[in-house]
Amino acid sequence: MGDSEMAVFGAAAPYLRKSEKERLEAQTRPFDLKKDVFVPDDKQEFVKAKIVSREGGKVTAETEYGKTVTVKEDQVMQQNPPKFDKIEDMAMLTFLHEPAVLYNLKDRYGSWMIYTYSGLFCVTVNPYKWLPVYTPEVVAAYRGKKRSEAPPHIFSISDNAYQYMLTDRENQSILITGESGAGKTVNTKRVIQYFAVIAAIGDRSKKDQSPGKGTLEDQIIQANPALEAFGNAKTVRNDNSSRFGKFIRIHFGATGKLASADIETYLLEKSRVIFQLKAERDYHIFYQILSNKKPELLDMLLITNNPYDYAFISQGETTVASIDDAEELMATDNAFDVLGFTSEEKNSMYKLTGAIMHFGNMKFKLKQREEQAEPDGTEEADKSAYLMGLNSADLLKGLCHPRVKVGNEYVTKGQNVQQVIYATGALAKAVYERMFNWMVTRINATLETKQPRQYFIGVLDIAGFEIFDFNSFEQLCINFTNEKLQQFFNHHMFVLEQEEYKKEGIEWTFIDFGMDLQACIDLIEKPMGIMSILEEECMFPKATDMTFKAKLFDNHLGKSANFQKPRNIKGKPEAHFSLIHYAGIVDYNIIGWLQKNKDPLNETVVGLYQKSSLKLLSTLFANYAGADAPIEKGKGKAKKGSSFQTVSALHRENLNKLMTNLRSTHPHFVRCIIPNETKSPGVMDNPLVMHQLRCNGVLEGIRICRKGFPNRILYGDFRQRYRILNPAAIPEGQFIDSRKGAEKLLSSLDIDHNQYKFGHTKVFFKAGLLGLLEEMRDERLSRIITRIQAQSRGVLARMEYKKLLERRDSLLVIQWNIRAFMGVKNWPWMKLYFKIKPLLKSAEREKEMASMKEEFTRLKEALEKSEARRKELEEKMVSLLQEKNDLQLQVQAEQDNLADAEERCDQLIKNKIQLEAKVKEMNERLEDEEEMNAELTAKKRKLEDECSELKRDIDDLELTLAKVEKEKHATENKVKNLTEEMAGLDEIIAKLTKEKKALQEAHQQALDDLQAEEDKVNTLTKAKVKLEQQVDDLEGSLEQEKKVRMDLERAKRKLEGDLKLTQESIMDLENDKQQLDERLKKKDFELNALNARIEDEQALGSQLQKKLKELQARIEELEEELEAERTARAKVEKLRSDLSRELEEISERLEEAGGATSVQIEMNKKREAEFQKMRRDLEEATLQHEATAAALRKKHADSVAELGEQIDNLQRVKQKLEKEKSEFKLELDDVTSNMEQIIKAKANLEKMCRTLEDQMNEHRSKAEETQRSVNDLTSQRAKLQTENGELSRQLDEKEALISQLTRGKLTYTQQLEDLKRQLEEEVKAKNALAHALQSARHDCDLLREQYEEETEAKAELQRVLSKANSEVAQWRTKYETDAIQRTEELEEAKKKLAQRLQEAEEAVEAVNAKCSSLEKTKHRLQNEIEDLMVDVERSNAAAAALDKKQRNFDKILAEWKQKYEESQSELESSQKEARSLSTELFKLKNAYEESLEHLETFKRENKNLQEEISDLTEQLGSSGKTIHELEKVRKQLEAEKMELQSALEEAEASLEHEEGKILRAQLEFNQIKAEIERKLAEKDEEMEQAKRNHLRVVDSLQTSLDAETRSRNEALRVKKKMEGDLNEMEIQLSHANRMAAEAQKQVKSLQSLLKDTQIQLDDAVRANDDLKENIAIVERRNNLLQAELEELRAVVEQTERSRKLAEQELIETSERVQLLHSQNTSLINQKKKMDADLSQLQTEVEEAVQECRNAEEKAKKAITDAAMMAEELKKEQDTSAHLERMKKNMEQTIKDLQHRLDEAEQIALKGGKKQLQKLEARVRELENELEAEQKRNAESVKGMRKSERRIKELTYQTEEDRKNLLRLQDLVDKLQLKVKAYKRQAEEAEEQANTNLSKFRKVQHELDEAEERADIAESQVNKLRAKSRDIGTKGLNEE
């Protein structure tokens, strides 16, 4: 995380992680791994040093303070490389030891980074100043961050715990430990603050809160002020030190919201209530009350505001500078309000606090001449008694003269002053402690909400390990607690560490480090440990601290390595023994331990407390029971003297609860460190910190880490950092996996290969190896840098040397020239040369100047031309840029349009595909739903059957269980009776031993025979059950087949109707028949494969059922074993209770022998403790018994042996006590040693107990076997007879029920068939009527259309006639006016007119005749239509009546079906029950026969042994008669058995035969069913495909129809009148077609629409052709109309004949309409919707095509513009090249001019300076102008390049547009091809329908055959059942 990522922490960032700059500075710090070390120091523990020398195992080093020291080599510890400075996780240190940890903490603390990780720990150092690391900004930054993603912080620990709780669904705990003043309480507050912020439940809790209460978050936070007021105090180290431990559980709901909280407290330091050291003070609440912030409190408590007036609270300091007691009082009082304390509860707590202060002021004195105490004034006692609700006199009397129970009486005992003062202090402490505990309970009650809670996070704030100069009982308890917590941490830490190794695949032997501390824990808590001995001593009234010490030394000194004798040092307090804890050796002083452990109270005063009028006080002591508390009834004497609990026992109990809580959570550890004793910020006291690191387990964790692999690096990081050690191992050019690279690199290095391991993602290192690698890396880097430096220095030296050589050569040349010049400078010729040479140059310069002037003028002219050219080019460039921008805008617009068009096109295509997919998906879903519905129905029935069977099984099991329970109780009663009679039966046992052997042999033989017969019966039963199951399955499949047959019949009728509609298109579909046959073959093959798979699955299911039955049998066996073990456990419990009674008797005898002495009490206590221990051990053994049967038996035996030997030992002890009463003390020591031996020899005792139990069982079995052998047989016979009679009765009832149900079934079946026949007749009649009605309607529509056409023709003839008459009138007028001039013309015209008139009249006559005939036809048709309408109405009424009747019939049929199904299910259940009963009957008969055989065997043996069992005959009585009767019964049963056996064999043979038939029929039926279902599915799928194809064809035809309509409109403009007539006729024709399609082809609605569209298209094409020959069309139309008129007349006559047939067809059609109406309406709606979508798609496609065309035109324009720009660019390039050439010429000219200028300067140095200056100025101007021109030229070149680049881009874009247009055109072509393909598919679908129809007929025929076979099989099954029932009844009658 870099500096930028740390910005989220705001101002806290510098206090959490060092910056990048600091990290870089640390890594560049000089460091020598071999010399930089830590050495030990007396004052600083360790200091940094550099090694100077090593000699003879010693090292001389110089410390950082300049001091030279010499130490042993093993005391020197290496420093870590600089990269590990201020590391955040100290477990990652390569050298992991104490000084490294210390200095890492010190360096981080110096930078105010107070939190540091140490493996699983988080170590925090108290900064003693406020740091900005707890702000809301920091809380938000840590929320949701992993531990590795953020710096160390208590918030990180909290958030990780919270996240683990949510993700792992596991409770969490945070353990915060440390010394007083280390910051435990503050960190606990921060944890609670964090949880309250991130897991707040919001307004929900606010709504629920009552007035005066806060939210749950506020209550959790406000619990701290209340606890701190009563539980915190000032100590030497800490002004606000918690003097108790607490475990706060914060409960969360399932979503992570706060739900509730509770608090548990431990080890409150109650001694502080009455005593404080000088630098300390009492609990805060006392001083808060005295602060006078609430004066009413002082008045209520009768106190002043001066602390020194009260002795208990003024022994130390009374004020603290950092605490404002007045403000704290208000905070405490407010906290009580928020927590819901009532005013009475608050005042009661304040009163008890004030009473404690008054208690400390009570004074007592000795009576004169007596040693008894009496009150010295009663004022304080009166105040205390008033506040506590007591009587003052009773209180003083109870303190000075308490009542003590002696024997059975109470006596008053006198107390001296010291005893009274001690009692007063003890009472004050008890009141305060109980009040504190009550307050915690009351807070828990408030925090306990009714909201659901699922997980919790516990926060443990408890004191750390304490090693003081004076360590007492409190330190032992605290250190014992920390020892347990450290063991818990060690176990958890290295379990996680080793789980990491396991996860990474590292070979590792598990080490349980939790056992390292077990020896010390056992020494403290185990029996005969320190706590145990302390409690034992507390039971002895005369025991002292020294006797306690003597017992400790006797039991542990020299026997336990952790127990030592201390070395007392002068000046230090005395120590009595030492313990070796994990944190170090602690010396303990045992003075006062017995008193502290017993913590006795004045029971007289406690009795007053219990009767107090102050409710709180009486509540606190309500459950107090002292040593003399009365014994409860029924508890015996075992409770006497042990009803009070010692402090150590209570502490251990609480600690065990805490450890149980912690073990059930995932822990997180926080260790708080106090840096110095002076509370100085930034100062760290090294010895103090090291002491704490040892005490709080940080160094213990380091010790564990060092044994593993503490350093680990990811493979990639390792390869990157350490590749430099051997680059050859990982070549640069080739790819090598990071892990392989790391393995190669490490294997190539000279290091110990056992020091590292390779995991799956990381490489693990032992401690120190990473530092060695860092050292090797530094050495490698130093060598490389040294080599680079050497090479660099060599290169620099060679460069310098080369410069020196060049300088030397130059100097030599100069020297040679100077020497030569000095040698010739005085020659005369040389002088002459010096004079003439300048003159020659001046003449040449004049010539050059002239030429330069000419050149200058020429250049000036060229410059002017170039300027003009440049301006022209600039103007052109501006225009080109403008054009270019325009083109860019146009191209951009075209691109946008094209992109939009493409997007719309893609969207349209996607929408189309989605719609098609949706249609297909809906159809598939419909099919799947139907299939699922059928499957679910079948499964439901099957599950109901199974449920009924399971219920019966459960009932049987319950009956069996009840029987077993009764037998168990009877057996237990027998065991008790036999135990009592065991002594009397010993003699009988001796006599019956021989008889027992013979009976055992006979019994064994009988058992073997019985087992064999049972095996046979089991096999037969299994076979029969299997057959019955198959019969049930066949019956179920038969019922299902009947339903399928009904469905198929309905489908058949539906398909027959479809057949009539599809016969017109059958011929077109025959071409694809072969393809469909091939597909059918493939489907058949797949179906066979599926059937094979189904059979395999059924076989697997049967196997699983067998396994299930076996497992159930195994479960029953295990339950029996468990029951046996429970009985054995009950026996052991009984023995244990007997032993306990004997132990109590021994104790009573001891009490009677020794009286009420303390020794006897001690002995009783000891015996009771031992007995409780034995009970715990026994209970643990019992629990282990239930885990495993083998271990259970063994441990039972051991426990019984142990108890037996304990009895012997206790009896020996009793004898010794009775004989040696005078030496009781010595004998007590012997008993103690004997008890230790008993504990050690526990295993041997358990074995002996097992032996005793075996002997007892043998005696018992000997006594029982003879009696049981006869009693069992007698009882079994009676039981079998009763069960047999019951089963016979049940069987008769079931058979009667079956016969009744069978008769009902036959009746229902007959009624159902009659109803079916009636229904079929009604349906046929209804279909016929519907068909007739539809035909009549169609004929009526045709006649109406013809009539309308004839009417129009008549009107047309009328118009022609009127026109002719008008022409005649015109000619007549014209003839009258021109009669004279044009007589001849008139005559000719008259002739012509007469001729035409005659023709017109003939036409009129014809038309009139035709009209009259049409009128007659019209009237006749109208009459017929009226008749037909009447018939139609009648048909409709009949159809409605039939529909109503049909619906009623359907209801009746549904009710009968339901009744039939119910009766069928009842029949099946009864049949199953009958079958189960028959199988049970067979079992019972077999068992009965076997028992008879056993009886026969026993009879023979009894005859042989008649003489030896004479004594038995007296006991058995009438056994001979019973056997004789049983013999008769046996013979009868044998005969019945033979008959039943033969009947069973016949039934099995017939069943096998029928089973074969049924299996074959079922297989054929399944094949037929599967084929029908497959074909139906294919048919549905093809219909759906055809439907989709038709929709697509409609779309394509619609587009072509639109085009044809446009062309037709253009042609029809020529003949508008004829077009109108034609349109009207087409409209009428299309209307008629639609009416016909709706009436006849509703199943194929889409196909009819397609045909209508095709007809319209054909008509449009024909109209387009016919309009070219207008006259011929009209004549043909007239002829057609006349022909149609004649046809209509014939049709009318035919309609009259076929009306009856139409009525029948009307009925059939109406039925089909009702069946298919719902489907058609949904399909029509879908079609309309898809038509609308497709029309929209077509319009959008047309728009897209139009836009593409526009884009193409624009692209063409852009291409032409680009070509023009390319030409202009070429011209510009030519101009640029010309300018470039001119530039080069000018540069050459300038060079020449410069050369001439140099020569002119030498010639005219003296005279031409002015002219030279002018020329130079001119040259500079020319140069400037040239540079400007060059810049402009460069800019123009850049502009031309940009234009050229833009032209290329435009050209490329144009090409892309053209390609897009081509793609769109291809897409349109593909769509058209798809339309054609869809047409072909529609034709294929119609052809396939014909094929499916033929196959359906074939399947129907096969189905009929299968039904016949099924009926035959069913009749045979019924016969077999009847036969089996007859056999059963016959056998029962014979019995």
UniProtKB/Swiss-Prot annotation:
Residues given in the record as ATP binding sites = 178-185
Q: Which residues carry this modification: Phosphothreonine?
A: 378, 1282, 1309, 1513
Q: Which gene encodes it?
A: MYH7
User: What keywords are annotated for this sequence in UniProt?
Assistant: Actin-binding, ATP-binding, Calmodulin-binding, Cardiomyopathy, Coiled coil, Cytoplasm, Disease variant, Methylation, Motor protein, Muscle protein, Myosin, Nucleotide-binding, Phosphoprotein, Thick filament
Question: What does the UniProt record report as the effect of altering residue 1692 to M in this chain?
Answer: In CMH1; uncertain significance
Q: What is the effect of changing residue 1459 to N?
A: In CMH1 and CMD1S; likely benign
Identify this protein by name: Myosin-7
Per the UniProt entry, the effect of residue 1768 to K is: In CMH1; uncertain significance
Q: What organism is this sequence from?
A: Homo sapiens (Human)
Quick one: effect of changing residue 787 to H?
Answer: In CMH1; likely benign
Outcome of mutating residue 1776 to G: In CMH1; uncertain significance
Q: What is the effect of changing residue 1573 to K?
A: In CMD1S; uncertain significance
Phosphoserine-modified residues are where? 1137, 1269, 1510
Domain remark text:
The rodlike tail sequence is highly repetitive, showing cycles of a 28-residue repeat pattern composed of 4 heptapeptides, characteristic for alpha-helical coiled coils. Four skip residues (Skip1: Thr-1188, Skip2: Glu-1385, Skip3: Glu-1582 and Skip4: Gly-1807) introduce discontinuities in the coiled-coil heptad repeats.
Q: Which residues form a coiled coil?
A: 839-1935
GO biological process, alphabetically ordered: adult heart development; ATP metabolic process; cardiac muscle contraction; cardiac muscle hypertrophy in response to stress; muscle contraction; muscle filament sliding; regulation of heart rate; regulation of slow-twitch skeletal muscle fiber contraction
Per the record, residues carrying Phosphotyrosine are 1308
Query: Outcome of residue 1820 to W?
Result: In CMYO7B; uncertain significance
Q: What disease is associated with this protein?
A: Cardiomyopathy, familial hypertrophic, 1: A hereditary heart disorder characterized by ventricular hypertrophy, which is usually asymmetric and often involves the interventricular septum. The symptoms include dyspnea, syncope, collapse, palpitations, and chest pain. They can be readily provoked by exercise. The disorder has inter- and intrafamilial variability ranging from benign to malignant forms with high risk of cardiac failure and sudden cardiac death. Congenital myopathy 7A, myosin storage, autosomal dominant: A skeletal muscle disorder characterized by prominent axial and proximal weakening, spinal stiffness, severe scoliosis, with or without respiratory and cardiac involvement. The age at symptom onset can range from early childhood to late adulthood, and disease severity ranges from asymptomatic to severe muscular weakness and respiratory insufficiency. Histopathological examination shows variable findings including subsarcolemmal hyaline bodies in type 1 fibers.
Q: By its UniProt entry, which InterPro entries does this protein fall under? A: IQ_motif_EF-hand-BS, Kinesin_motor_dom_sf, Myosin_head_motor_dom-like, Myosin_N, Myosin_S1_N, Myosin_tail, P-loop_NTPase, XRCC4-like_C
